[in-house]
Amino acid sequence: MGEMLNENTSSTSLSSFYVLENETIFNVQEEMEEDGSESGNIQKTLLEDPCPENVNDENEDEQNRSSRSSSPLVKHEQRHRMYNLKEVIKSFILTKSKEKPCDLEMGIDSIEMGRMQSFESDQQESHTGQANFPTDQEDPRNPQLDSQYEAFITQGESQTDKKKTSTVQEEELQNAGKKLETVQENPQAYSKVTQQEPQAGQKAVPQEPQANQQETSSNQEESSFDRQETQDDKQKPKTTQQEHYNLRNRNQATITNSNSKPQTRRSKIFVISLLGYGVYLLAFLDLIEYVSKEYGFEATVSAQIFLWCLFGVLMIARGLIYLALFRNFLNILKRMAIYCGACFWVYACIFFLTRVFCFLIDTPYPQFEKIPLEIYSIFAAINVYIIELGAIYCTSGR
């Protein structure tokens, strides 16, 4: 009798399982076609009838229920029903979700792995007659993976905290830079705004007098500090463009009386050059007189030769000085070009002045023999001094 009851219950349970399976699949397909949602409706249909026990007759005894639920055939039918549902979901995903191929492949792989595991468990049940289910004592989690996951989470949180702090610091620096720019552009207006801030705070929030008093005191301190800064800026001497240029080149924070140092340096160089070239001219005047007497050259021709030789010597000396000071070849060429341009420009000016002088003394320009040698030597000396002064001014400090 017991065997007959078990067979009847198993047959009724099989028929009820097949009916339930068809109903759930039909419900899943209808809800997917109506709503278009993939996960919520499937969960609803599965939650409505999670187990086939609700289909059984109400008159069954508890013994029949326990024996039916513990039988391996019932468990096999449950697995079969669940994997049929997975096949329906898989077909639906293959037809409708084409936007995420990676998720689709992962879902298909997980379904295939589950199918292989179920096949292995069915084989074990067929050999041993017992289902291979994990016991309560076995822990499926891996402690190494848990520790790695916790370390990964803490590392990500620390990185996000660092990013937040860096962004906050950048915003504070930008706000401070904007505040400094506004103070430098219009310090008086900024001081007025800081003076008016506590009054506006007192009027706006009369319910909190202590907080307003603290805000007004802090605002007054800031306004007094801003006033002191503006007064210090006013007391400082105004700097010129050349001083700003020197500050930028030398990378110095503060330089007092920076305009006096280049002037003293230039004056020293100019005095030394005057003395040196004065002696140079006196020596060459005797040489010009000797050449003009011995070889029959005119004084003007010998003076012109002297000037061109002097230009050559000056350019060679300048080139050696620049080579000692500046090792960069392009910088040397640039400074020599400035020096040569200054030399030829001043030389043209000197010849223009000589023509004006010839016009004033009523002599034609080509007749240089009527011009005394002393006057021509004076012009030559002035020429040399102006050239040296222009070269010093053009090349020093640049």
Swiss-Prot record:
GO annotation, biological process: meiotic cell cycle
UniProt function note: Has a role in meiosis.
Membrane-crossing residue ranges in chain numbering: 269-289, 305-325, 341-361, 373-393
Stated name of the protein: Meiotically up-regulated gene 126 protein
GO CC term (a single one): membrane
Topology versus the membrane: Multi-pass membrane protein
Keyword terms, alphabetized: Meiosis, Membrane, Transmembrane, Transmembrane helix
Biased composition annotated in UniProt, kind: Low complexity: 210-222
Residue span of region Disordered: 30-81, 119-260
Main location: membrane
Biased composition (Basic and acidic residues): 224-236
Localization annotation: Membrane
Ranges of Polar residues composition bias in the record: 119-135, 183-199, 248-260
